[in-house]
Amino acid sequence: MKKSKASALLWLFSLVGFMLHAQTFNLNQPMVAQNVIFEEKDGLVAVEAEYFYKQTHTDLREWYRTTKDSVAVVGRDEDANHYLNASNSSYIEVLPDTRVTHSDQLVRGVNFSNKPGQLAVVSYKIKFNSPGRYYVWVRALSTGSEDNGLHVGLNGTWPEHGQRMQWCDGKKYWMWESKQRTKDEHCGVPHAIYLDVPKAGIHEVQFSMREDGFEFDKFVLTTNSNYVPIDKGPNMTLADGNLPSSYKSKSEPSYFNTIARKLPENKFIASQEFPIDGTNFYKNGKNWLAINPEQYKQAKISTLFDFESGTYDVIYVGVGENDGRSTFRIVINNKELGTYQPPLTQMLWEEGKAFNGFWKNVKLNKGDTITVEVQVASDGNEWTRGRWAGIVFAPVGQGYVVQESPSTYIFEK
């Protein structure tokens, strides 16, 4: 009996090992067919990094997909899974990652390549309707100083202005960047990474490893030198072929949108529904208002309560940040309802119950003026932006229940 159980366990472990190996093997293979062609329209094209149709130069390093449920196991890789807030909940990473810190040995042509096109090259077909200069933006996540470099090329060539893309800011969260590292500027020169597309038609855009451990989520090509992608970037456009069924063009609802619609009796005002002219606020992505601390340190904004008069539980959805605790003050008809500061978060930004302001049994009349005053804060190095998502008015006694929804981790730290 014991021998039978031991044999069964051995068989099970062997099967699991085989499955893990097979999964790792598949994670470096193209997800899309060779006939998949993305399309540039009006000077803009966006592509998910995991939708390469071909990968070459893989003897020493390869790109592997990471998803919520799949992580490649191919040698050293000390990073956590960063699928949270990755576009399409997936990204690719150059593995193995043997140079994690500056003290690790640098081996040129193995874990580092200042020459483009030498290691781990992924290719994408794009139909360009217009020739011209296209500035390259890449959404990447860097955890240190040795996983923040990449090269980009066109049709098998690697022009000087596609070499040495560099990330210095925003460690440990997904960030768009378009800078070129130079001898004089190690953190990169803006507007210096671009591809010159000679004529309309189908061309191949390629990326190759500069440093192993690089995590690559999405890229955008644009003819507009002033364009800056935000959030997860624009949607993709296809000229031909089909994407995998797993592709989701719509993101999941944020914490605010989830709790605002949790009960049919809820009333809510999203922050971006407040009139912002002259308030010192700006629209931060699709869900928040925020303050640019380089211009202002505080902001004030008002709107009318245009719902049925009554008594409500009031939930103010602020955003936790990792560089300080902003102060939020809510006023109704010139009378303070309350003031609070969301706690610090281990993420860059986070929505959730812990970051809310909450007041019970608040009497409100239709036509009341609701005012929000925000003061930014600093940890001594960086400033918060006083981000907030909106206000939910829940039935009395339901406010605690309404807040119980999963947090939105906008970027993982």
Swiss-Prot record:
| Location within or outside the cell | Periplasm
> Which key words tag this protein in UniProt?
Periplasm, Signal
Q: Name one GO cellular component term.
A: periplasmic space
What is the annotated signal peptide range for this record?
Answer: 1-22
Regulation: induction: By ulvan.
Task: Name the Gene3D superfamilies for this protein.
Answer: 2.60.120.1620
* Source species, domain of life: Bacteria
**Is-annotated flag, keyword Signal?**
yes
- What job does this protein perform? May be involved in ulvan degradation. Ulvan is the main polysaccharide component of the Ulvales (green seaweed) cell wall. It is composed of disaccharide building blocks comprising 3-sulfated rhamnose (Rha3S) linked to D-glucuronic acid (GlcA), L-iduronic acid (IduA), or D-xylose (Xyl).
Instruction: Give the protein's recorded name.
Output: Uncharacterized protein P23
Species source reads Formosa agariphila (strain DSM 15362 / KCTC 12365 / LMG 23005 / KMM 3901 / M-2Alg 35-1)
